[in-house]
């Protein structure tokens, strides 16, 4: 199944495959970045929420987390959301990639975007 066909099929719950292998990562270091696209009901049928998962209680937690600026309060909200997602057995997480990345200062300064995947960073020699 090629990617465009998969994206089209998961949009319709009656046509979606029973199992989909998807690698997903964050664009920036915030739980909202991953959890919203993967588990908020508004995203059901997108490639990131191919399971068509919908849960009003988790939606409320994710919405509260998105609207809260206090770091400790946000952590509790997202901890609760993640526990409920795991308890709902939404998906089967097979593994998490562990990567050890390094760079040498002779290549330039630190990465230009410290919140991004280091494999995608650009370096400046100046």
Language-model features, listed with the residues they occupy:
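Short helix-initiation/N-cap motifs at beta->coil->alpha
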Residues: 1-8
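Detector for C-terminal structural segments
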Residues: 9-126
């Amino acid at each position: 199944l090629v990617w465009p066909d998969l994206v089209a099929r998961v949009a319709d719950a009656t046509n979606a495959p029973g199992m989909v292998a998807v690698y997903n990562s964050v664009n920036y270091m915030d739980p909202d970045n991953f959890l919203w696209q993967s588990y908020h009901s508004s995203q059901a049928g997108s490639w990131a929420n191919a399971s068509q998962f919908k849960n009003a209680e988790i939606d409320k937690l994710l919405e509260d987390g998105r609207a809260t600026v206090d770091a400790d309060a946000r952590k509790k909200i997202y901890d609760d959301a993640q526990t409920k997602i795991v308890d709902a057995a939404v998906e089967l997480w097979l593994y998490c990639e562990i990567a050890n990345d390094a760079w040498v200062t002779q290549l330039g300064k630190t990465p230009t975007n410290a919140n991004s995947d280091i494999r995608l960073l650009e370096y400046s020699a100046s």
